Structures are given as C-alpha cells and as structure tokens.
Curated annotation (Swiss-Prot):
It comes from Mus musculus (Mouse). Residues 1-24 form the signal peptide. GO terms for cellular component: endoplasmic reticulum lumen. GO terms for molecular function: iron ion binding; L-ascorbic acid binding; procollagen-proline 4-dioxygenase activity. This is Prolyl 4-hydroxylase subunit alpha-3. Residues 420-527 form the Fe2OG dioxygenase domain. It catalyses: L-prolyl-[collagen] + 2-oxoglutarate + O2 = trans-4-hydroxy-L-prolyl-[collagen] + succinate + CO2. Keywords: Coiled coil, Dioxygenase, Endoplasmic reticulum, Glycoprotein, Iron, Metal-binding, Oxidoreductase, Signal, TPR repeat, Vitamin C.
C-alpha cells in the first residue's frame, strides 16, 4: 500500500465524526433521506481517491521518466564510456540511483519482483567506494586542468584562468550533471573536510535544485534542503558566516520546524553581531596540499599543455629519422624515430605496433586486469596517486607477443629475455586515471624491483595502445616537457646513467585522462644482461 493509499484510509477513519454516524450505519436503507445524506461522505472519498490517483500518476510519470532516461543511454550503444562525466553518472546510477528507486516503492507483488531482481544483481554493482573514487576523479580533473564546476555541470570542459574562461575541450555529445550528481561530488569532499572542493560543487547543487523549484526525483538521494544544509555548514567552517546565515535562513523557509537549523541561525546572528563585518567577508579558501607531491605546480602546468610540442625548426637539435639500429630485423621496415628531447634522451617511435596488434594486446590483458600498485619500501601498495588497473602478460600467452619482443630487442639493442626484462605490463586508466610524478627505476635498495636479481631498471619502453580525446600526456617534470598520447607509438628512454646511477631527469608522470580510454604497455629492461650491449662508463654525464 502506497503513501497515498494510507492517506485515503486515514481520511475514511476521520469520517467517524459525521452526524450521519449517530443514527447508525445499519438503518441507512430505512429512509431515502439517510441514503441521500450518505452521498456526502462519498464525495469526500472521491476527493481523497482523486488526490491518491494524482499522486500515483505523478509517481508513475517519474518512474517512466527514469526508465526512458536510462533506456536512451543503453540504446545508443555507439557511445563509449570515455567522458568522465558520463562515467561518473553511470557509477552513481548503478550504486545509488537504482537503490533509491527500488527502495522508494511499496511492497506490492510487482514491486517485490523488481526488488528481488535488484537484489540478485546488487553484488555486481559498483560499491560506494567506487562512487567516492569517481567523485574524487572529477575533483582531480578540476584541479589539474583548472576546470570550471559550472561548466562541468553543463557537460563542457572550460578552463578558468583569473577572470577569463576558455573552452578546453568540446565533446561531441554533452552529458550534463543533475543537482543530485553535484551534491554527491560535494558531499564526498565535505565528508573529508575538503571544503575547497565541497563548496563549489554544493553551490552548483543548490543552484540546480533552485532552478528545478526544489522538485525531487525518485532516484535522488538529496534535496534542496540537504544541499542548503551542507553548504551552510561548509561556509561556516571556512569563516564565511554571512553566507552560512543566508543559506540557513533559506533552509528554514522550506523546513520551518527544524530546531537544529533555527539554533544555527541564532548562533550565526550572534557571531556577526559580535564581530561585525570581520566575519561577513568571504574568505579565500586554500586548496588542500598534497604532501607527497612537491612538484605539483610543474606537473599540472605540463599537463595543461595537453602534450603540445615545439616544432623541430624551433629546436634544430630535435630530429626525425628512419632507424634500423644496424639490425637485419629492421632493414626492410625501419622504425620511424622522432627525438622529442635530448636531456634526458627521449625517442618516440611512430606506428611501432599496428591497430590489430594493439587491439590483441588489450584483449589478452583485459580478463586479468587488477588495481595497479606502487613500490613503497619493501611493499607494494594501492595508492590514490596512481589510478589504473594493470595485467602482466608472458610472451607464451600468444605468438604475437614473441614477435613484439623481437621488435623491441632489435630497436633497443638490449636483451629483453627473462630475467633481464620484466613481462609486458598492460595498463588501463580509469576515470581521470593518472600516475603522479615517479621514477621507473628503484631509488631504494629495499625496492621489490630487486627481487628479480637482475639489477635495476635500466630502460623503459612504453607503447600507447589507444588514443584519447584529451589529456593523458606523459610529463617529464625536470625535463619540463610532455609527450601526448600517440596511438600505436612507443616511447623509449634510459632510466640509469652508464655509471649505474639513476637519472633524476627521468622523473615523469601520466597526466589525468580528461576524455578517453587510455591503454599503455610497458616493457621494463634491467641492468643485467646488458653489460656488452650498453657498457658502463665513468663519465657521470653518459
């Protein structure tokens, strides 16, 4: 029985005070005047039933709207989930919206079947931690690419620099966020005390709820009152008491009986009266510092270039060539080499793999993908500064991988057979996927990299297995340059000097993927086995 039906029953019970009841219902038939008088309560019943039907019609219209919205996304199968806004809404819908829809309904027979169906697949749906991760990914993109929250809510990617706003990327199809979407992002930040991110997202949620005149949808978890409540306290926490007071007063317009909010209003009024304009002014909120990332400004600045490079005539020492490395393997089909930087020496080999090979590698790796880890002392940990999944492929998995190994060995001149090189690591980046500045080589003698007993990682060979629409560049922090994602190309650099010391200039990062599905394959080659292929040198510059 729905809420409307319960109201109808209450209305019927309320009819007990009618004067006609005093004569007893059992003798209504005995006089026509009593029959006529009985029509009056029926008219009231009709009114109650009409209100119930209208409520049910509104509820069904809302459910139909939700059904049509989700169905339209499934019917358009040509759209890959590469837009971070679309990806966030998919996770939120599966984790939160469906649960709210199903549990908002009453337990009729049909609804019971719907709930049973939901419970059967519930274990396969994203968890709340996934929703939190997707929300943090949007905040990461907001920070690194200086994105405007209002623009993101409309589905556009705009960069904010001072008072100017410029379009950073224009998607072919817009995916806007709802008020409840914005509220959920803001709440994730709010729950960790991150008011720098919470406030703009909650402000946008309030704005969108107001624009909808406070209309609540079945799948929504929050309402205008919720958004006002959270935003008011966030403003108070950063010292903007005037804003907190204004929002709290607005809250009381919609919920005048809320005693907690009434007490807050009195507190804010008292604080303003005692401190005057000192607490009324808006306070500048500092972005939370990232303690493990001391090179944040350089890293983000390089990511914001989206991998744009100077042309070769601007730096004549950079060049392109056909490379055989004196290998018979490459004699008939030399590699297309582009030197993108000299110190450290970074080479980009265009079309190193074919579309078919890149697709095959992705297909081989996909069933084995697991959350990527990083070396921390003697342990390997999952961390927030590396968001991706990875898999390791032995060359015995498919003959194509043996061919790929031969090609890498011919081009680098190095021995890449185990244990002198690691298995091929295939990485798929998630929503806003990134890997903040790091070295590929070990910087500690206790690093797990030494477990292979083949020395440190002397070189990195990284293959781009896909293209992206925006973001995802590889940024070299101390080299002060970045390389864009070039599908099927391979990036090569030396991690160690010939002396065996690590090259500090190879500190690099995978910039967050703004829009796209980024796949890379890494082949890490170790010191041992390369003694005569890359001889040692006492010159620290080599």
């Amino acid at each position: 029985m729905g809420p409307g039906a319960r109201l109808a029953l209450l209305a019927l019970l309320a009819l007990g005070g009618d004067p006609a009841a005093a004569t007893g219902r059992e003798d209504t038939f005995s006089a026509l005047t009593s029959v006529a008088r009985a029509l009056a309560p029926e008219r009231r019943l009709l009114g109650t039933l009409r209100r119930y039907l209208r409520g049910e019609e509104a509820r069904l219209r809302d459910l139909t709207r939700f059904y049509d919205k989700v169905l339209s996304l499934h019917e358009d199968l040509k759209i890959p989930v590469v837009n971070p806004l679309l990806a966030f809404t998919v996770i939120k819908r599966l984790q939160s919206d469906w649960r709210n829809v199903v549990h908002s309904l009453e337990a009729t027979e049909n609804i019971r079947a719907l709930k049973d169906g939901y419970e059967k697949v519930e274990q396969d749906l994203p968890a709340f931690e996934d929703l939190e991760g997707a929300a943090r990914a949007l905040m990461r993109l907001q920070d690194v690419y200086m994105l405007n929250v209002k623009g993101l809510a409309r589905g556009v990617f705009q960069r904010v620099t001072g008072s100017s706003i410029t379009d950073l990327y224009s998607p072919r199809q817009l995916f806007s966020l709802t008020a409840d979407d914005c509220f959920q992002v803001g709440k994730v930040a709010y729950d960790t005390g991150d008011y720098y991110h919470a406030i703009p997202w909650l402000e946008e949620a309030v704005s969108l709820f107001r624009r909808a005149h406070g209309e609540w949808k079945t799948e929504d978890e929050a309402s205008l009152e919720d958004a006002l409540d959270y935003l008011a306290f966030a403003c108070f926490q950063v010292g903007n008491v005037s804003c907190a007071l204004s929002l709290s007063r607005e809250f009381l317009v919609y919920s005048p009986d809320n005693k907690r909010m009434a007490r807050n209003v009195l507190k804010y009024e008292r604080l303003l009266a005692e401190n005057g304009h000192q607490m009324a002014a808006e306070t500048a909120i500092q972005r939370p510092n990232v303690p493990h990332l001391q090179t944040r400004d350089t890293y983000e600045g390089l990511c914001q270039t989206l991998g744009s490079q100077p042309t070769h005539y601007q730096i004549p020492s950079l060049y392109c060539s056909y490379e055989t490395n004196s290998s018979p393997y490459l004699l008939l089909q030399p590699a297309r080499k582009e030197v993108v930087h000299l110190r450290p020496l970074i080479a980009l080999y265009h079309d190193f793999v074919s579309d078919e090979e890149a697709q095959k590698i992705r297909e081989l790796a996909e069933p084995w993908l697991q959350r990527s880890v990083v070396a921390s002392g003697e342990k390997q940990l999952q961390v927030e500064y590396r968001i991706s999944k990875s898999a390791w492929l032995k060359d015995t998995v498919d003959p194509m991988l043996v061919t790929l190994d031969h090609r890498i060995a011919a081009l680098t001149g190095l021995d890449i057979q185990p244990p002198y090189a690691e298995y091929l690591q295939v990485v798929n980046y998630g929503i806003g996927g990134h890997y903040e500045p790091h070295f590929d080589h070990a910087t500690s003698p206790s690093s797990p990299l030494y477990r292979m007993k083949s020395g440190n990682r002397v070189a990195t060979f990284m293959i781009y297995l896909s293209s992206v629409e925006a973001g995802g560049a590889t940024a070299f922090i101390y080299g002060n340059f970045s390389v864009p994602v070039v599908k099927n190309a391979a990036l090569f650099w030396w991690n160690l000097h010939r002396s065996g010391e690590g090259d500090g200039d190879t500190l690099h990062a995978g910039c967050p993927v703004l829009v796209g599905d980024k796949w890379v394959a890494n082949k890490w080659i170790h010191e041992y086995g390369q003694e005569f292929r890359r001889p040692c040198s006492t010159n620290p510059e080599d």
